[in-house]
Each structure stands twice: as structure tokens, then as C-alpha cells.
Regions:
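Metal-dependent phosphoesterase core characteristic of DEDDh/y 3'-5' exonuclease domains
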Residues: 2, 15, 26-68, 88-170
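Short acidic, Gly/Ser-rich segments with clustered Asp/Glu that frequently serve as metal-coordination loops
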Residues: 7-15
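Metal-dependent phosphoesterase signature
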Residues: 63-86
Length: 172
């Protein structure tokens, strides 16, 4: 089983190498969406949650990226502990965790599990990073040291389907 997920956050960490236990370093989770697929690609489960902010606000610069304001999150959001328990349940069914720049999303969720003092196996799961796996496939010049650059999710989609997509639609 493959657990494919993405997060939206309050921003970026100060230090991408910091441990998830460094709570002040890692931004807060605003939204998480995931799909669980069988080994044959069958869609098994779909979840999408906006998190109700407790003890933080969503900066305007982050809102401009994902479209979720503090007001909206307070009105539509659910408790973080519920989200973490649901996500843990899906993790327990999976063999691989998949995402685009997955190390960022794993650290975001790891920090939230740490803050909530909820145990998880997320940090120990096998991962597939579509950003890294698709770099040679997309073959976009401009990477470091003469290598190809990492493709954005939009660039990967364009290469796979020969058409772009509107990222703003996924944050509704």
C-alpha cells in the first residue's frame, strides 16, 4: 500500500536539518491531504483536513500560497489530535510513504506528532520522493553542478500529461 500525502503549513523552517523535536524551528500544520492506494493503484482511502490553529496564527504570506486564513481554519478546522490519529491509522496500513519533497512533509508531521506527544512510526517508514524520482525523467536543465534541476509538482505534471494544471484549485 502507498500513502501519498501533502501538507500546507505556516511557512518554512529556519533550519531544514533541525530535528523534529526542535518545535520552534518547524512551522505548524495548516492542512494535510492524503490518499491510500493498493499496490495495483486502486484508491482505498482519501482524507483532507484543515487543522484548527491552537496557539498560532497563519501568516498572510502563507495564506497567499495555500489560501487558508486563520479565520477559515478556525471556522472549518478540526483538532490536530484527531488529524494525527487518523493519519497514524493510515500510516499503519501502508508500505511506502510518497510525496513531492517528502522529507519536508515528514518533518512537518514529525514535529506535530512530537508537539502532541503522540507516538508514530512515520519517521521510520520507507519513502518515495517524486521530486527525486522524477528529476532525470523531467530532464530540466539548471540544477546544481550541471545536473538536472528538481522538478516542481507542476513541471512533473506537465511532463507526465503534456498539460499544466492550476495549483490554486487543489487548495479549495
Amino acid at each position: 500500500m502507498y500513502l501519498i500525502y501533502d501538507t500546507e503549513t505556516t511557512g518554512l523552517p529556519k533550519n531544514f536539518s533541525a530535528p523534529v523535536s526542535d518545535s520552534d524551528n518547524w512551522p505548524r500544520l495548516v492542512q494535510i491531504a492524503w490518499q491510500l492506494h493498493s499496490d495495483m493503484g486502486e484508491l482505498i482511502e482519501v482524507k483532507n483536513f484543515i487543522v484548527r490553529p491552537e496557539g498560532f496564527t497563519i501568516p498572510y504570506n502563507a495564506e497567499k500560497i495555500h489560501g487558508i486564513s486563520t479565520k477559515r481554519a478556525l471556522e472549518k478546522g478540526v483538532d490536530l489530535s484527531f488529524v494525527l490519529k487518523e493519519f497514524n491509522n493510515s500510516i499503519s496500513k501502508s508500505n511506502f510513504i510518497v510525496g513531492h519533497n517528502i522529507s519536508f512533509d515528514i518533518n512537518i508531521m514529525g514535529a506535530e506528532f512530537f508537539r502532541a506527544q503522540i507516538e508514530t512510526t512515520l519517521m521510520d517508514e520507507k519513502t518515495i520522493d517524486t521530486k527525486e524520482e522524477a528529476t532525470d525523467f523531467c530532464a530540466i536543465p539548471g540544477g546544481r553542478g550541471g545536473k538536472f534541476k528538481w522538478p516542481t509538482l507542476t513541471e512533473l505534471h506537465s511532463k507526465l500529461f503534456n498539460q499544466g494544471f492550476n495549483l490554486s484549485l487543489i487548495h479549495i
